[in-house]
Amino acid sequence: MTAFGKKWLTGLVTGALMAVSAGSLAAEQKTLHVYNWSDYIAPDTVANFEKETGIKVVYDVFDSNEVLEGKLMAGSTGFDLVVPSASFLERQLAAGVFQPLDKSKLPNWKNLDPEVLKLVAKHDPENKYAMPYL
């Protein structure tokens, strides 16, 4: 695989992993706890999301896979949505740190490209925990 392909796949599988179903949590509690790479979203993304949905976002960032993994492996983090990289995803799944996605609460799941989901499945074999991000 080319360097571009690996980079693309890593970005792609930097899947939105749910510690709980963000959709149901947001609907019930109106707060979404996100743990993402620093500088992954535009400065106004959270504010725009909050304005559009009425859901408050608590947005925390990390700057390395090791920091993310240390927090996840330590136990209950309280995060609803976590954005790991593909290279650490399989190990985190094996450790049981994520809950399965509730696809009934992801109405656009059906619109995802099957070829892209096959790439994600290389790290999450049944597409139970991860979904494409980029």
Tell where the protein language model's regions lie, with residue ranges.
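Bacterial N-terminal signal peptides that target proteins for export
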Residues: M1-L12
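Sec/Tat signal peptide C-region and signal peptidase I cleavage site
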Residues: K7, A22-A27
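Bacterial N-terminal signal peptides
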Residues: G11-S21
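A generic structural signal for secondary-structure junctions
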Residues: V13, M73, A94-V97, D102, ...
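Early extracytoplasmic/lumenal segment of secretory-pathway proteins
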Residues: A27-Q92
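Short aromatic-enriched loop/helix-cap "lid" or pocket-rim segments at secondary-structure transitions
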Residues: V46, A94-G96, P114
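A structural signal for short loop-to-beta-strand junctions that line the ligand-binding cleft
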Residues: T77-L81, Q99-L134
